[in-house]
Amino acid sequence: MALKRINKELQDLGRDPPAQCSAGPVGDDLFHWQATIMGPPDSPYQGGVFFLTIHFPTDYPFKPPKVAFTTRIYHPNINSNGSICLDILRSQWSPALTISKVLLSICSLLCDPNPDDPLVPEIARIYKTDREKYNELAREWTRKYAM
């Protein structure tokens, strides 16, 4: 079941890739993918290229994939291990969701962080109290790690 679904998503991604994103298997292992997200324009991540790993569970799509950034990023919802705080990767997962939709959700999280549910409270505090400093630090990390 999982393999069939993963193959179908791979074909759909090839036919109709989401804007600013790409993803595909690492070598022959269809359960382990690498994804790329381009820093969205008009965000402090603009110009950066961010890499992520995707691990599909054997009972996919009934359980969510494990998605993590391998590129460091300054963001209140993404910690230094690359873990992402995004409801659809946890409690709000649904088998109707696809990797394409997950990547688009992560893109929109980059444009629009959720400081009220942070993985990194200190970054969330700066985001809420000093947006200019947040943008400056996010741009600096993007230049340092994603270019």
From Swiss-Prot:
- Which example biological process does GO assign this protein? chromosome organization
Catalytic activity from the UniProt record: S-ubiquitinyl-[E1 ubiquitin-activating enzyme]-L-cysteine + [E2 ubiquitin-conjugating enzyme]-L-cysteine = [E1 ubiquitin-activating enzyme]-L-cysteine + S-ubiquitinyl-[E2 ubiquitin-conjugating enzyme]-L-cysteine
Question: Hydrolase: present as a keyword of the record?
Answer: no
Q: Cross-referenced SMART domains, in alphabetical order? A: UBCc
Q: Identify which residues the record assigns to the active site.
A: C85
Which SUPFAM superfamilies does its entry note? UBC-like
According to its UniProt entry, the function of this protein is described as:
Catalyzes the covalent attachment of ubiquitin to other proteins. Mediates the selective degradation of short-lived and abnormal proteins. Required for proper telomere behavior during cell divisions and possibly for ubiquitination of proteins involved in postmeiotic stages of spermatogenesis. Deletion mutations are lethal in homozygotes.
What the record says about family reads: Belongs to the ubiquitin-conjugating enzyme family.
- Indicate what this protein is called per its UniProt record: Ubiquitin-conjugating enzyme E2-17 kDa
